[in-house]
């Protein structure tokens, strides 16, 4: 299609418009995260992002170095939440919040809840 394999960017843009394709760079993007089913995520810091519109559908192209982040595990279990809720006489929601604030320390969470 293009002799010598070289593509003139202006010709390419014109050809894309003729085919009903639009593209627009998105500036100011600091971070892009793609959340995966297993709880991990792909994180792109300061990527180049381009929005493309082809036949009334939008596509986003993300370019940059991806870093895979593993899911954060809670430092406590559902059993811990139930125990704290029971011991402190509060709801499981309040117990979970207290455990999050104390980094999973059961005794500290119970004492905080009883002190309120």
From Swiss-Prot:
Stored SMART domains: NAC
Gene Ontology annotations of biological process type: protein transport
Top-rank taxon: Archaea
UniProt protein name: Nascent polypeptide-associated complex protein
A Pfam family assignment: NAC
Gene Ontology molecular-function annotations: RNA binding
UniProt family annotation: Belongs to the NAC-alpha family.
Every NAC-A/B domain range: 6-75
The entry's keywords: Protein transport, RNA-binding, Transport
SUPFAM superfamilies documented for this protein: UBA-like
């Amino acid at each position: 299609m293009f002799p010598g394999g070289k593509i003139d960017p202006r010709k390419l843009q014109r050809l894309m418009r003729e085919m009903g394709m639009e593209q627009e760079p998105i500036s100011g993007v600091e971070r892009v995260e793609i959340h995966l089913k297993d709880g991990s995520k792909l994180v792109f810091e300061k990527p180049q992002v381009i929005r493309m519109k082809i036949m009334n559908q939008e596509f986003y192209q993300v370019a940059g170095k991806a870093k895979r982040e593993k899911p954060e595990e809670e430092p406590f279990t559902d059993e811990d939440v139930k125990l704290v809720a029971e011991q402190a006489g509060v709801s499981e929601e309040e117990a979970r919040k207290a455990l999050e604030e104390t980094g999973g320390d059961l005794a500290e969470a119970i004492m905080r809840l009883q002190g309120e």
